[in-house]
Amino acid sequence: DVGPIRHLASQFGFMGDEDFERTNIRAHGALEPLGCLGDLGWYCLRFSLWAMNEAAPLYVTGRIHQESAPREGSPSVPLAFSGFLAFAGGSSASFYCSFTAAHAQWAVVSGDKALLQVSDFVLPFSGAESKFNLIRSEFILDRCQFDMQEGGHLESVEEPSSNAPG
């Protein structure tokens, strides 16, 4: 139990090869007009909304960091995008999705009791098993001396998935 959620952060992306922007449908405005947001970002959004019990955000902002060149008369599409969602009670979520950065598919849930880290929240690294760390760090303050001590444990869960071998 992480306690009440204060912030969620997630990232899903991969580095497309040198021909990606020119040849892949994900970078073609007529075939995937939302680019990395439509292909990858929705995983981050759904994770955040699921963790927040489907609560609607109060407001949402986003920024395109990089976009494709227009192709064959079609508009450009986002190649790198970040977003922010604000929820009632002061909770928030941020995410980044990209076709132009090293592969990443992590999520972090910060609560007032603990931190939950998931390094493979979209595609399990091994078969149908996802792992997460539940971290309960302790901040020790003695007058002007302070120390941060990490405490936590790794958990594994079976995930029904079509990605599982066999």
Q: How should each PLM-predicted stretch be described?
A:
Residues 16-21, 77-78, 142-147:
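Short hydrophobic/aromatic-rich motifs at helix boundaries and adjacent loops
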Residues 26-31, 76, 104, 145, ...:
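Exposed boundary/loop context
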